[in-house]
Design a protein with these regions (language model features):
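Short, charged, amphipathic alpha-helical segments
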Residues: 31-39
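Amphipathic alpha-helical coiled-coil segments
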Residues: 43-54
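Short terminal alpha-helical segments
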Residues: 1-30, 82-83
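Extended, non-membrane alpha-helical segments enriched in charged/polar residues
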Residues: 20, 39-42
Length: 88
């Protein structure tokens, strides 16, 4: 599986996780910001289509989420993969 294929697969997986987190916020089961989650979801979707975007969500996560949040860690890792994929 190529780097781009791995990135795309992980992106789709994380979009599903972010959507599930938005649902948890709506149900009162999560205290994350719905606005932040929606921004992240939009950027993830854009990242599938366009290489080289300047994405803001890693800064959002680093600045305001718990450093050990597993979803946050996965999202920041995906941003790093995106940088690598965008170089090609």
């Amino acid at each position: 599986m190529s780097l781009e294929e791995k990135f795309y697969k992980k992106n789709v997986e994380l979009q599903n996780k972010v959507s599930a987190e938005i649902q948890k916020v709506n149900e009162g089961l999560s205290e994350k910001s719905i606005a932040q989650l929606q921004t992240i979801l939009k950027e993830l979707d854009s990242m599938k289509e366009v290489k080289g975007l300047i994405i803001s969500y890693p800064r959002i996560i680093i600045d305001s989420w718990d450093y050990s949040d597993s979803l946050g860690l996965e999202l920041v890792e995906l941003a790093e993969q995106y940088k690598k994929v965008s170089k090609y």
